[in-house]
Amino acid sequence: MAETTNAPELHPVTEELASGKNFASVTTMLPSGQFQTGVMWVGVRNGSVVLNTETHRRRYKNLESDPRITVMIRDENDPYRYAEVRGEVTRTTTGPEAREHIDELSRKYTGSDYPPDAIKSERVILEVTPRRQTIIDQNKDTSD
């Protein structure tokens, strides 16, 4: 079953998947026009899908040039259930709040704080505003 919405509010399944211990495949556009996709930790904050990266990383530089982003969050317990969010990064947050946020995500995924020696540049929270969300659940029976 597939369900699509163009609403800027998070679909309940998107929020559920982003709040859980599920990984996101995140796609941004390189300056050459090619796509770059990587796996990231994901969360929900202020009604938005949020990611956390560092300012020296290619992904962040891509988003500075072009804020469009696709975030696909797969249910770790059921790979045939996922949410795709196409949207834009509409807010970024740096400083102590971003540093604490990466610790929150790290505790969610690993059980401990993010290692300080792994940080090479300033942390930044990326808030994604959806323009289109597609929810896929291939196990859901749509016949009544």
State each model region's role.
Residues 2-24:
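Short, basic/aromatic recognition patches
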Residues 54-58, 109:
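Short, solvent-exposed aromatic-acidic interface loops
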Residues 21-55, 69-73, 82-85:
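Short beta-strand segments
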Residues 57-59, 78, 142-143:
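Short, surface-exposed beta-strand-loop junctions and turns on beta-sheet-rich folds
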Residues 2-8, 81-144:
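Charged, gly/pro-rich active-site loop segments
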Residues 9-13, 59, 101:
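Hydrophobic alpha-helical segments typical of transmembrane helices
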